[in-house]
Amino acid sequence: MTEGTPPTSKATRLRLMEVAIELFKRHSVAGTSLQMISDELGLTKSAIYHHFRTRDELLDAILEPVLAEVSAIVEAAEAHRTVRARADHMLTGYAALAARNRDLISVLSGDPLVLELLNAKAEWRAIVVRQMRLFADVEPGVGGQIKAMILLSGFAGAARAEYSQFDGPLDEAAFRDQLIAAGRRTLGLRAPRPAD
């Protein structure tokens, strides 16, 4: 795209979603209006409506690819034979997703409107329930459920944190590895032995 060429519709849509996530971080989903997004982008509200008629439609577009990826991780994890192997696969896959999507994970985990939307869509709720079960099954009963909740809440909290105040910025690979290590400790999993 050369200077002066208007951005493509797809590029505008992606930029709109990026700005929405940033505003969701600052103001929550409920605290962010389409008007705020249009103001931030310098677009008219009608330009926003061209892509998304409502904030919920925008939120759907943001959530859909993430939940599709979580679903793929869940399905691959469920194919493993043992409870621990299933949990470890879910853990490593979700840690990689969280590391790639830190801003999004920090916003989407715990925002009341996001939770409401997840619960309203049966297929999305089912994905989250299956994910939780993969973590919780490591320790049957309420203890496993609590550990699963701590793990997911911890990932969201870690994604929100600003690490540069400590040792400098944390890159994606280092962040992923730290999430995996903390998750294994939380669930009582050992790292798989390296193949010879």
Regions inferred by a protein language model and the residue ranges of each:
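Short linear capping/connector segments at secondary-structure termini
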Residues: 108-114
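Hydrophobic/aromatic-rich alpha-helical bundle segments in the mid-to-C-terminal region
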Residues: 106, 117-125, 129-196
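Solvent-exposed, amphipathic alpha-helical segments
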Residues: 19-26, 69-77, 154-162
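Short, intrinsically disordered or compositionally biased N-terminal tails of bacterial proteins
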Residues: 1-4, 194-196
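Helix-turn-helix
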Residues: 15, 19, 23-57, 61
